[in-house]
Design a protein with these regions (language model features):
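Eukaryotic intrinsically disordered, low-complexity regulatory tails
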Residues: 1-6
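Calcium-regulated, polybasic anionic-phospholipid
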Residues: 7-16
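Autoinhibitory propeptides
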Residues: 15, 20-102, 106, 110-112, ...
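Short alpha-helical segments and helix-capping/turn motifs at coil-helix boundaries
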Residues: 91, 149-152, 182-188, 245-250, ...
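Short loop/turn segments at strand-loop or loop-helix junctions that form parts
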Residues: 101, 107-111, 202-204, 265-271, ...
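Substrate-binding/access-modulating region of protease and related hydrolase catalytic domains
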Residues: 117-118, 270-330
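Alpha-helical scaffold elements adjacent to nucleotide-binding pockets in ATP/GTP-utilizing enzyme cores
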Residues: 156, 216, 237, 241, ...
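Subtilisin-like serine protease catalytic core
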Residues: 189-221, 225-282, 312-316
Length: 330
């Protein structure tokens, strides 16, 4: 259901149409209406799942005019541009002109997760050995599939109606630290007991033996691979920032105040290399670990995550990384 320009706000959602018997909303995104030298004209579209009965009910309401005297219906219908299916080109994004094959993420609409027939259709179109793809599903949510694909596979999948999007699957990346790497640290705080309020940090590890961290940081190893010095340095800096804030302007003779929180540092990087490109990218295994920790530690209500897939996250583009974090934050 494509909206007219300038009707992107949530308040313009065509709720009356989406509540027609047999029609269920399953998400939304932005779309491009037109391109010109002046720029792109964009608006919002809403995804809906339906059946022949749902379409029949909608057709009857439109043709019979039974809701035409309802002001809300009038206002909502007038903001709709078209009702149609996504074009194949709208489902594939983020690939360079030279891309030939590699790791991709396939996103399918929610209802396919409970539909064995549609799932079999998808796997037939995917046509890959079991070690070449990994599927992660969420109750009442999208299905995400990391896979090793080529152009031919993408072209087959693009014609599959339940497909929402396909984009490259980025590898895990921790950004370089900004500012000076070395300066004389202030005097460690007085120990007055471990604060009960705990904050979780997912990163490349932390040196919990440092005087500033040893009483306030608990290190948890979630990967069997030896920590990388640069990743540990990054995680150590993050833990320091959580406990003390910005230290750059503190003098070396100034004693720090005792932190009011303590930190659980979860080292999820580097991930173990197995020879399987999906596992070796590190992204899906890291998401699995983050979800498990957050679900198992309900006593912790705040977490910090300092890494993500390499490259920009396209605005309004759904991925398992962004979806999982949004879901965990609820």
């Amino acid at each position: 259901i494509r909206m007219e320009p300038k009707f992107e706000a949530k308040s313009y959602s065509p709720d009356m149409l989406l509540s027609v018997d047999g029609i269920t909303p399953i998400g939304g995104r932005k779309y491009v209406i037109s391109k010109s030298e002046e720029g792109l004209v964009k608006s919002k579209l809403y995804f809906a799942k339906t059946s022949d009965l749902g379409l029949k009910n909608l057709k009857y309401i439109l043709e019979s005019g039974q809701k035409d005297n309802t002001v809300t219906w009038q206002n909502q219908i007038s903001t709709i541009r078209t009702i149609d299916l996504l074009d194949s080109t709208e489902k594939i994004s983020g690939f360079s002109g030279t891309w030939d094959s590699g790791l991709v993420e396939i996103v399918l609409h929610p209802f396919i997760w409970n539909d064995a027939f549609a799932m079999q259709q998808f796997l037939t179109l995917l046509d890959l050995e079991a070690d070449k793809y990994k599927i992660s599903g969420y109750e009442n949510g999208p299905l995400f599939c990391a896979a090793v694909c080529n152009h031919e596979t993408l072209e087959r999948l693009a014609k599959f109606n339940p497909l929402r999007t396909i984009h490259p699957l980025g590898e895990l990346n921790i950004p370089n630290m900004r500012g000076s790497s070395f300066f004389d640290a202030p005097v460690p705080p007085l120990y007055k007991g471990t604060p009960q309020m705990r904050i979780g940090v997912f990163d490349g590890g932390a040196d919990s033996t440092l005087p500033h961290l040893k009483d306030f940081v608990t290190a948890h190893e979630l990967t069997p691979i030896t920590g990388h010095p640069a990743l540990i340095a990054h995680g150590t800096a993050v833990c320091g920032a959580v406990l003390y804030g910005l230290l750059n302007y503190k003098s070396s003779t100034e004693q720090l105040e005792t932190p009011i929180v303590s930190v659980d540092s979860y080292r999820v990087l580097p991930q173990q290399q197995t020879g399987n490109p999906i596992e070796d990218s590190g992204l899906y295994p890291a998401i699995d670990q983050i979800e498990q920790i957050v679900h198992n530690h309900t006593e912790t209500s705040l977490y910090n995550l300092s890494f993500g897939p390499r490259g920009a996250i396209v605005d309004d583009d759904i991925s398992r990384f962004t979806y999982a974090l949004d879901r965990l934050s609820m």
